Amino acid sequence: MKENNNLEKLDPIATLETKFAKSSYFIADEIKDEKINAISTGSIHIDQITGINGIPVGKITEIYGNESSGKTTIALQTIAECQKTGGTVVLLDLEGSFDINYAKSLKVDLTKLIITQPQTGEQAFDMIETLIKTNSIDLIVIDSVAAMLPESEYQANMNEALMGAHARLMSKGLRKIQPLINKSKTAIIFINQLREKINTFFGNPEMTTGGKALKFYASLRIETKKADLIKEGINKIGIKTKVTTVKNKLAPPLQTCFIDIFFGSGFDYNNEIIDFAIQYGVLKKNGSWFYFNDNKIGQGREQLKNTLSKNNELFIQISEKTLEFVNNEKSNWQ
């Protein structure tokens, strides 16, 4: 094919600089491989399966699942952990279901938690945009996607059919805030629910509310499923929840763990320490007996837990050794 000598080859960079600002482009190798900052969920198990040590900063996270599967507990524990490091948190309580007593039991600092209750989804997204632009909010939690009522639906009467209004709201709102989030130091959690698909005979009969936009924009999607009840005799004292990273753009996805959530107190941190102490060999097991530094400290897991609950000094020793292993592994996650 003959070259057309009349066509002048233009320098693409010079052309961009002439027509647009210098900031309109960059060279690929100028991108810094920055470490992803994260806010701990308060659960070592969940932090581990995210691969980044918790909820990512500057990204959107969706936590979804059926009723009473641990979604709110994970969000509240994350709020508490964020506050522990001096972070500022805003909760958009669209459901109007914030439980002060439960939040307090999970060590949420109510004196520093900002709560707002927008009436519509549009108002909620306007608030999110405004909060991100302040550059002073570390975590925003939206509870929940299902309660983000579109303005059109808010003003309509009960007889009007407004198909797809919720999905359009989510698509427009997320498209608007996504560029702001990426440049911010704010982590955003959307709590979502599952509902049944109509006339589904094959595949998963459940889907999240709000259409497909949140699935697309979320960097991390965490699913919670109630796996079992935790009982003490005949009394039901908690639930065992299966947690799965269904989508993860920051680390390997489809990682799973099981966590214990106790009614009124949330995660069992001590139990998680025991799990990891056994995993890393801090606690050794011979038969039914558990050993620490070659000393018997409990026969069976329940006796072990009782021993550690009564001997705080021993628990601290085991915790410190265990967390050394956990923290070393965390550096490899990121």
Curated annotation (Swiss-Prot):
InterPro entries: AAA+_ATPase (IPR003593), DNA_recomb/repair_RecA (IPR013765), DNA_recomb/repair_RecA_CS (IPR020584), P-loop_NTPase (IPR027417), RecA-like_C (IPR049261), RecA-like_N (IPR049428), RecA_ATP-bd (IPR020588), RecA_C_sf (IPR023400). It is found in: Cytoplasm. GO terms for cellular component: cytosol. SMART domains: AAA. Keywords: ATP-binding, Cytoplasm, DNA damage, DNA recombination, DNA repair, DNA-binding, Nucleotide-binding, SOS response. Its main location: cytoplasm. Pfam families: RecA (PF00154), RecA_C (PF21096). ATP binds at G65, N66, E67, S68, S69, G70, K71, T72. It comes from the Bacteria. The keyword Nucleotide-binding applies. One of its GO terms (biological process) is DNA repair. Signal peptide: none annotated. GO terms for molecular function: ATP binding; ATP hydrolysis activity; ATP-dependent DNA damage sensor activity; damaged DNA binding; single-stranded DNA binding. The keyword Cytoplasm applies. NCBIfam families: tigrfam_recA (TIGR02012). Can catalyze the hydrolysis of ATP in the presence of single-stranded DNA, the ATP-dependent uptake of single-stranded DNA by duplex DNA, and the ATP-dependent hybridization of homologous single-stranded DNAs. It interacts with LexA causing its activation and leading to its autocatalytic cleavage. Belongs to the RecA family. This is Protein RecA. It comes from Ureaplasma parvum serovar 3 (strain ATCC 700970).
